[in-house]
Amino acid sequence: MSSRRTSIAVVGTFDTKLDEFLYLRSQILEDDSSINVILIDAGRSVVQHEAVTIKQDEVAKASGFQGFENDFMSLPRGDLVKTMIKGAVKVVGRLKDRDEIHGIISLGGSGGTSIASAVMRELPVTFPKLIVSTVASGDVSSYVAETDITMMYSVVDIAGLNEVLKAVVQTAAAAIVGMAKAYVKKLNNNGHGDIKTTKKGIGITMFGVTTKGVNAARKWLESHGFEVYVFHATGSGGRSMERLVKENRLHGILDLTTTELADELAGGVFSADSSRLTAAAKAGIPQIVSVGALDMVNFGPKDAVPKKFQERRLIEHNPSITLVRTTKEECEELGNRIAQRLKENCIRPDLTEVWLPLRGVSALDIEGQAFYDTLADNALFKAIKTSLDGSEISVKELDTDINDPSWSESIAKRLSELIELKG
């Protein structure tokens, strides 16, 4: 069994926060003096210090920028930041590919966090990533996106070494040391830093109103030897699943809960983006797509629901989330979008199917419940069937709702058959 010296990359803008980064370095080494700390300067101007491993001009040149000595400092701030991100991504990527780093950490305000997070998002899921940031107590979705970046709030600004900031940095240093050592341990044991499994991985999308059906499908798949990853369909959940497909970590997809498309269409808070429903199709892996929770759009507190939706059927799911029923017209458009994205991206339509639960697409859409609306549902189903007619993507209709046990077992079993068919 080979062993490695744990190495941690520290990336940031040293021209504005050198003292803070040097303190971070000292705390990492105080925790374990054997660790190799690589300081990577992604700032605006060159900093001369013996502790800096990869200097700012090296990062800029790694981006491919020409004429560094004469033109770099004259770049507009936005262009300069983009250049440094591009260069830092290249530098850090090379270090990772050569097994020369086992974790990465940064400190920053909004600018430094933007640079560091852009670099970290290019690293694989499970590789240790930590940012101490002044913006970490707010909405960090634009920084974290679909990755596993850990954000730690700095409490005070990263501007001078006071006792509060030093305590936060000490904690962050200990955290990244522990994370990096755990990663190295996996490398030494497995030969790679990922979770070790010999099972084929399945991704399933879930929402509260599709939980019963998803759990039943999950249990069936697990009992038949699959490793199941459930993704909460909150925008970031769907994007995370798509990313893991791109990283070749999943062998099949049960996209039972495509509700993020409804939020994308109507401006809800759980929107993914236009790449949703494309990764598995482009990868050619087996997938079964359904229409879970397309009966709803998600907004914040009830008083925050846009006026144009106030006259619709609303359900206050909890104090933070209000559900709005999708209309017949919206459901028709959603059906068209699902079909179109699959048709445009599928390289193996023979391994892609769409399943429709005719008696309800969520726990709130069955007879007697608040969102039960056969006209809207039928518009959704018809649009999918019409748009996919003539394609090689098959559509299956079941006379049940999406949480029925018979539905769950049938759809899970069928996915396993498609995986076996692919080989």
Q: Model-derived features: where do they sit?
A:
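C-terminal non-catalytic interaction/assembly regions of soluble proteins
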Residues: 2-3, 7-9, 17-38, 268-423
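N-terminal phosphate-binding or glycine-rich loops at protein starts, especially the Walker A/P-loop
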Residues: 2-47, 103, 113-122, 126-131
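Gly/Ser/Thr-rich loops at beta-strand to alpha-helix junctions
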Residues: 12-19, 102, 106-116, 136, ...
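Glycine-rich phosphate/diphosphate-binding loop of Rossmann-like nucleotide-binding domains
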Residues: 17-25, 38, 47-54, 196-235, ...
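Phosphate/nucleotide-donor binding subsite
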Residues: 50-98
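Cap/lid and interdomain-hinge subdomains that line or gate substrate/regulatory clefts
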Residues: 72-76, 139-209, 333, 395-397
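Short, acidic/small-residue loops that bind anionic groups at enzyme active sites
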Residues: 103-106, 115-144, 153-154, 229-233, ...
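Short Gly/Thr/Asp-enriched flexible loops that form oxyanion-binding sites at enzyme active sites
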Residues: 106-125, 214-218, 366-373
